[in-house]
UniProtKB/Swiss-Prot annotation:
One of its GO terms (biological process) is protein-containing complex assembly. Residues 1093-1123 are cytoplasmic. The gene is nra-4. Residues 19-1071 are lumenal. This is Nicotinic receptor-associated protein 4. Its main location: endoplasmic reticulum. It comes from the Eukaryota. It holds the Pfam family NOMO1-like_1st. May interact with nra-2 in the ER.
Length: 1123
């Protein structure tokens, strides 16, 4: 049996000392919660869920502290009455004695984040969704259970409970308000079902969903539904007059559906519609009767036809009064905007649309109907007729006419009919018409004809001609001007240049418009007049009269323009410009005028002289824009406020006039557009809100760009009582922690802070070593306390012997030390001294495994400057089990976890780790409980070694149990290395030397490998992670290959190292080449068996003996009992 440990060998790890670790923290809440009434507990659980320890939180501040005696994985959870919720729900801890929160004395914090909101919906089945909302935002959701019961969780606040999305039923009033403060809430009274869901479906005849159908519900009375507005109605087609309330309930979604919740029981009429401007869809059946009663209802609509409209245009201009043909039948006439409504359009049907008008040809379009889309292109004019009459000459000849398009200069020659009439269809546009024969006496000689909105049918070319005269009446000499003559429709006949008299020769009869253009030099009573030419011997004459002189001015930005005659100031006037435009100013006489610009912009010249008349355009350009702001000075005449303007060009300062109640202005160059300015007000007496503001320069004037409020600052006279000198007092602005005001108290404890706006805006603190300062109800005033001392000793109540290893927790309660907290493990003296304590109430708790202290928490009152002495006594209430684990050889086994588990005592569990000498002590075992004690695992989590016996059954009494000794069988962990040498690549090599070292220098082995053998083995090496260097070199000169070295780490059961050989003369180390045992499945296994024949036979025999002992009935499960 001496070979048994070779089969069951396990990993040995260093042992851990039995230290005690403090897992401390607090249960915090933003709402005032009475922990003493709740009796909150924090539980320490193993990963299997076994409870290791349970501790009540401090009733004053929620603090807790739990001792942990063994390293390992644990879970902390808060145990509380139903309806209280904490985050996190649990905290996972791996105690390693170094890096975990408990070992580092870091706080473990649970936050009481919410409470239950529960209630009942009478008459509701299970599955009704409910939501909890705050200001419209969803906080929680749930579904009712059997009986209509529900429960949600929420932090303190004011909420509303209502049905959630997908609910087919609604509760009474739709929602109810609840307020969560510091405890679970029961919603009363119970909800009742008040309505049901209405489902609407819309589709096309081709079974596709119809989107955005508008649904209107007609009822006999107004219904109270969220987000639905009901108004009185005079009824609708096919809706009974009794249903005179109209409610818009929404639109269908992309699936063609609309769900309306909470519709009360009753009889309704539902109508569907879809209107997109002039386009609409007709549904069937529409409307339809809907009865809501005891369950969700539904209505279905089918989109059957559409109504659209067509527009008739010519060159994008609307044509009114035009008859429209739909499928060759009259559909009506267009309105003033060229539109006509077309009804009963079917989806996917072929519908043609065109128009009809005299002397006009139109395009034909097709209606494209694909619900809900209805598209009809404009019907456009293709041809207009130009018609007229040509008078015969004296010898009876009818002259031809030439039509020329103005846009592309294409021309067409027209021959009138025998009666002189002509009618030519042309595409819309502008044309010139003139006699083809340049020597012909036909007039007019040239006509400009516009055919954009209608045909032209009244043109007349005649051989009659006469002259027309235009006279100018000027102030002084008339300037050179141009008079143009137009026919109706803006057809230019002729333009004539001159000064005071303009003659238009050889023009035909008709009504003309004469327009005067003098290049803007003069002002005229009329610049356009009507000229009528009749077929008579009298030459028509008209007169244009000048009433002033004009000057052209262009100002770059908006401004008011004022002018006055330099010699006669009574001749003055004003006008305005929006900037960037050329305007004319009219003055009564010529001469020199003074012009000034009034604007928020600064110009290159704000005033200038202008000589009238003036050829050309006078221009002025703005160079800066005004920015203004205000500071509310509260009518303070002595404010002495200045403004600092910070920019990339530097800082500049301006004074704020107090008489204008804080209004200030400054000018910023237009070139600074896009720059950010920072405006900072300052004063020795006043404070400002905000302290600064930014303005972006836009290149435009900015009125009231910034506004500051100001107020006189106040100074706080603070105090410390009893007086403490040289205390440091800091006032930190709550909104900006960088704003700090400091002061030092004098010998009377007085100090001054300021100027400030409101003391309440600052957090004020006082500090000095050896003192504690508590703010009073009056800001800036403190109560000072000289700190005190407390000594605590912990002893056994029977023997009065000091109890070392006690975890002592001291927590502040009421008074100046309410935020104090300290945890300490007592040494062999069992004594702890606390210094510099603030006077007040403290809670002290002593914790030692197997001991109970009564009361569990003691209250100690520490008085100012006093030294308090306290003795705590503990009574032993649980006991230990002692034992040892050793190998069959007698060697101690360390770092094995021994566990004691009691199924009969609520799965109470405790464990310990074996020490260097293999001993262990399992603490905290309860009397009258029966435990199973067994090896659980190694401390690193690897499986425990096999032991004899497998377990002990221990019935605990009020005494320790000793002598629980385990004998373990272990298997040593080793590594075998197979070295494969690439000798086949160099057949001339007959033998090589293998040199093996570790840790770079330590010699391990030197061996020769002779061909044809090319494998070498190292067996039973310790699996300890050591790196081995394997060097293969030529055994005899001459050297046919360069020596090779590979490195292997002993960290697995089997490692294979390959060493390739080449004829290269260069020395070279190669990288690790490591495979697994499977890479050489046959020859490596065979070689191992060959080289270890005795060991294999011994292992096989040991395994057979072990199997017989294990499966034969034996008494290896010993029972130990102490009474």
């Amino acid at each position: 049996m001496g070979s048994l440990p070779l089969i069951l060998l396990s990993l040995l790890l260093p042992g851990a000392l039995a230290n005690v670790y403090s897992c401390a923290g607090s249960v915090k809440s933003t709402s005032p919660v009475d922990y003493s009434q709740l009796k909150l507990q924090v539980r320490l659980l193993t990963l299997e869920g076994h409870m290791k320890h349970e501790e009540e939180v401090n009733p004053s501040n929620g603090y807790f502290m739990i001792p942990v005696y063994n390293k390992g994985h644990y879970t902390l959870k808060v145990s509380a009455p139903a309806g209280y919720y904490f985050e996190p729900d649990s905290i996972e801890i791996k105690i390693d004695g170094k890096t975990d929160a408990c070992s580092l004395n870091e706080d473990l914090v649970f936050h009481l984040t919410g409470f239950s909101v529960r209630g009942t919906v009478d008459g509701a089945a299970a599955g009704l969704p409910l939501v909890l909302t705050e200001n419209g935002k969803q906080i929680a959701e749930t579904k009712t259970e059997d009986g209509g019961k529900y429960e949600m969780r929420a932090p303190p606040g004011k909420y509303e409970v209502s049905t959630g999305a997908g609910a087919s039923e609604c509760i009474s009033k739709g929602k109810t308000s609840v307020e969560v403060k510091n405890a679970p809430v029961v919603v009363t009274p119970n909800f009742k079902i008040s309505g049901y869901q209405l489902e609407v479906h819309t589709r096309t005849e081709s079974m596709n969903p119809f989107v955005d159908a508008v649904m209107t519900l007609y009822a006999t009375s107004s219904i109270d539904l969220p987000n639905i507005k009901c108004v009185g109605s005079e009824g609708s087609l096919n809706v009974p007059s009794t249903h005179n309330v109209k409610c818009s309930i929404g639109k269908t979604d992309p699936r063609g559906r609309l769900s309306v919740a909470c519709v009360p029981s009753g009889e309704y009429y539902l109508a569907a519609s879809h209107v997109n401007g002039p386009k609409s869809i007709n549904f069937s059946p529409n409307p339809q009767k809907v009865v809501v009663s005891q369950a969700a209802s539904e209505a279905r609509f089918v989109a059957q036809s559409a109504t659209g409209r067509v527009r008739v245009t010519s060159k994008d201009l609307p044509l009114s009064g035009v008859e429209v043909l739909v499928n060759e039948k009259s559909g009506g006439k267009t309105d003033s905007q060229g539109y006509l409504k077309i009804e009963n359009l079917k989806e996917d049907e072929h519908t043609t649309i065109t128009a009809k008008a005299p002397n006009t040809q139109f395009s034909t379009v097709h209606a494209n109907v694909k619900f809900p889309k209805v598209e009809i292109q404009d019907v456009t004019v293709q041809k207009f007729d130009i018609c007229g009459q040509v008078e015969k000459s004296e010898n009876g000849v009818l002259g031809k006419l030439t039509f020329t398009r103005k846009d592309d200069k294409r021309s067409l020659e027209i021959q009138p009919k025998a009666d002189g009439s002509f009618c030519q269809p042309v595409s819309p546009g502008l044309f010139t018409i003139e006699p083809t024969d340049k020597t012909s006496s036909l007039t007019p000689r040239l006509l400009e004809v516009e055919v954009l909105k209608n045909a032209v049918t009244n043109l007349r070319f005649t051989h009659f001609k006469t002259n027309a005269n235009v006279h100018l009446s000027c102030i002084g000499a008339c300037p050179t001007a141009t008079v143009s003559l137009f026919l109706p429709g803006q057809t230019l006949v002729r333009s004539v240049k001159g000064t005071d008299v303009f003659t238009f020769e050889n023009i035909g009869p008709g009504t003309y418009s004469a327009r005067l253009d003098d290049n803007g030099r003069g002002c005229w009573e009329k610049s356009e007049m009507t000229l009528v030419v009749e077929q008579s011997n009298t030459q028509p004459t008209i007169h244009f009269k000048q009433n002033g002189f004009a000057a052209q001015i262009e100002i770059s930005h908006p401004a008011e323009i004022e002018w006055s005659n330099a010699d006669k100031k009574q001749l003055n006037g004003k006008t305005s410009t929006k900037g960037g435009e050329v305007i004319s100013i009219c003055v009564p006489t010529s001469g020199v005028y003074d012009v000034s610009l009034g604007s928020c912009y600064k110009f290159e010249r704000q005033q200038f002289k202008l000589t009238v008349p003036f050829d050309g355009v006078h221009k002025e350009k703005a160079v800066a824009a005004r920015i203004s702001g205000t500071i509310d000075l509260e009518n303070d005449k002595n404010a002495a406020v200045s403004i600092r303007i910070k920019s990339s060009a530097g800082d500049r300062e301006i004074q704020v006039p107090a008489l204008d109640n804080g209004r200030f202005t400054f000018e910023e160059p237009l070139a600074s557009s896009g720059e950010q300015l920072v405006i900072v007000p300052s004063s020795k007496l006043r404070l400002f809100e905000p302290t600064s503001k930014s303005v972006t320069v836009t290149g435009k004037c900015i009125e009231n760009a910034v506004k500051f409020n100001s107020f006189r600052g106040i100074f706080l006279d603070g105090s410390i009582k009893p007086a403490v000198e040289k205390a440091v007092v800091k006032a930190v602005l709550k909104k900006d922690k960088d704003v700090v005001i400091e002061a030092i108290s004098n010998k009377d404890g007085a100090f001054k802070i300021g100027p400030v706006k409101r003391v309440e805006d600052y957090d004020i603190t006082a500090t000095l070593d050896g003192f504690k300062f508590t703010p009073t109800s009056t800001p800036g005033h403190f109560q000072s306390v000289k700190l005190s001392q407390l000594s605590i000793k912990v002893v056994d109540e029977v023997t009065n012997a000091p109890l070392d290893g006690v975890l002592l927790s001291l927590v502040g309660g009421k008074g100046a030390g309410s935020d104090y907290r300290s945890n300490n493990v007592l040494d062999e003296t069992a004594h702890k001294n606390y210094v510099a304590l603030a006077p007040g109430e403290y809670f002290v708790r002593a914790i030692l495994q197997e001991y109970k202290f009564s009361p569990s928490t003691s209250t100690i009152v520490v008085k100012e400057g006093q030294h308090e002495n306290v003795v705590l006594k503990g009574k032993r209430v649980s006991f230990s089990a002692y034992g040892k684990m050793r190998e069959m050889s007698g060697d101690a086994m360390k770092d094995v976890i021994i566990e004691a588990l009691s199924e009969g005592c609520d799965l109470h569990q405790s464990e310990a780790t074996t020490k260097e000498d293999g001993t262990y002590r399992i603490r905290g075992l309860l009397p009258d409980c029966e435990y199973q004690v067994h090896a659980k695992s190694y401390a690193d989590g690897s499986p425990a070694p096999h032991s004899f016996p497998r377990s002990f059954t221990v019935s605990m009494t009020a005494e320790d149990v000793k002598g629980l000794e385990f004998m373990a069988t272990i298997t040593a962990k080793t590594t075998d290395i197979a070295v494969e040498i690439g000798m086949d690549t160099l057949p001339e090599i007959q033998s090589v030397r293998v040199v093996i070292t570790k840790n770079n220098n330590d010699h391990v082995q030197v061996a020769s490998v002779v061909a044809p053998q090319h494998l070498h083995y190292l067996v039973n090496l310790p699996r300890d992670g050591v790196e081995y260097a394997i060097r293969v070199e030529a055994e005899k000169p001459p050297q046919a290959f360069a020596a090779k070295t590979v490195r292997v780490v002993a960290d697995q059961a089997m490692k294979v190292a390959r060493v390739p050989l080449t004829s290269s003369k260069r020395a070279n180390d190669v990288d690790i080449s490591v495979g697994t045992f499977l890479s050489l499945p046959f020859f490596v296994t065979l070689a191992l068996v060959f080289f270890n024949q005795n060991r294999v036979l011994e292992l096989l025999g040991t395994f057979i003996d072990w199997a017989r002992n294990t499966f034969a009935p034996t008494a290896d499960n010993h029972h130990r009992k102490r009474k």
